[in-house]
Curated annotation (Swiss-Prot):
Keywords assigned by UniProt, alphabetized: Disulfide bond, DNA-binding, Glycoprotein, Host nucleus, Secreted, Signal, Sushi
Organism of provenance: Heligmosomoides polygyrus (Parasitic roundworm)
InterPro entries: Sushi/SCR/CCP_sf
Domain named Sushi: residues: 151-211
Gene name as annotated: ARI
GO biological process: regulation of cytokine activity; response to host immune response
The protein's name in its UniProt record: Alarmin release inhibitor
Disulfide bond annotation, renumbered to this chain: C183-C209
Length: 297
């Protein structure tokens, strides 16, 4: 006897199988029990229990054999499921599907109602590390200056290998992770200072590192007696407390100041060798001093 959902099936006459709905089976059972064939029915029940003990009884839940695209897959970063290139909400048992990921779709197989990834590397739709992405670019296409460090939240699992240029290989940041790059040259410009991993991509677009300004060149070009910074770079651009990846070692010239730093410049007075006059104020703007300096007389 097999049970298929709410349908009961059992052997009857030779080479025949009878299937009844649950209510029909109950009525049939009462009627059959009262008949003269009840002893034979008891033998049938014994055989049924024997099949159950041996594992030959099968329960087939047709709906459960299909796989559905659910919040489980959405939480992993996937935005949909493709079956033969078409967007689908369900897939039959044994079918191979593609889960849509911003950095390339992943293959999954429907196994008894559960979507199984084809490889551990495709267990979720995460984002690639920022520094790893930059070092994968041709050298001439990389931004300059580069980020000095990158901080992620939450912190990923510690990778097992270190690749070229000391950058971790194989780190995958889960959907919803945040990233904040840090530049020794000043706050990032021309973009966002923070991004979120959304379906395999960092959004919005991160900004780039600005260029620093030279105090020496300002002093020389403007013929200033003295140039003094009135703000500090660390106040404008506090360094991160935690760094999850190896920072790029950079030697910053003490003559240079960060983007956004303000300075005052003094000209030497004409009637004195020590006094100063003609005070001018400047701000470092991505490698250039603004406003344009007026040279001392």
């Amino acid at each position: 006897m097999d049970i298929i959902g709410q349908v009961y099936c059992f052997t009857g006459a030779p080479h025949t199988i009878t299937c009844l709905l649950r209510e029909q089976f109950i009525n049939w059972y009462i009627k059959y029990k009262r008949s003269e064939n009840y002893p034979a029915f008891r033998e049938l029940v014994v055989m049924y229990r024997l099949f159950l003990a041996l594992g030959f009884l099968t329960f087939i839940n047709a709906a459960g054999q299909r796989c559905r695209f659910t919040d489980v897959e959405r939480d992993k970063g996937y935005t949909g499921m493709l079956l033969k290139g078409r967007l689908r909400k369900t897939a039959g048992n044994g079918r191979t599907v593609e889960l849509i990921c911003g950095r390339g779709n992943h293959n999954y197989t429907c196994e008894s109602g559960v979507l199984k990834e084809s490889s551990p590397r495709q267990a979720r739709c995460g984002c690639k590390g920022i520094l790893e992405m930059l070092f994968d670019m041709p050298k001439e296409e990389r931004p300059s200056p580069m980020y000095d460090s990158v901080t992620y939240d939450p912190t990923p699992n510690t990778p097992t290998t270190v690749g070229k240029d000391g950058i971790w290989n194989g780190v995958d940041y889960r959907n919803g992770s945040t990233v904040k790059p840090y530049c020794d040259t000043g706050p990032v410009i021309n973009g966002s200072s923070k991004a979120v991993c959304v379906s395999g991509k960092w959004v919005p677009t991160l900004g780039v590192c600005p260029k620093m300004c030279s105090i020496g060149s300002l002093k020389e070009n403007g013929k200033f007696v003295d140039v003094t910074a009135t703000t500090k770079g660390d106040e404008l651009n506090p360094p991160p407390r935690e760094q999850t990846l190896i920072p790029i070692v950079r030697k910053v010239d003490k003559d240079k100041v960060q983007h956004g730093v303000k300075v005052v410049a003094l000209c030497k007075a004409e009637d004195s060798t020590t006094a100063a006059e003609g005070v001018q104020e400047f701000e470092c703007d991505n490698g250039k001093w603004k406003p344009e300096p007026v040279p001392c007389p």
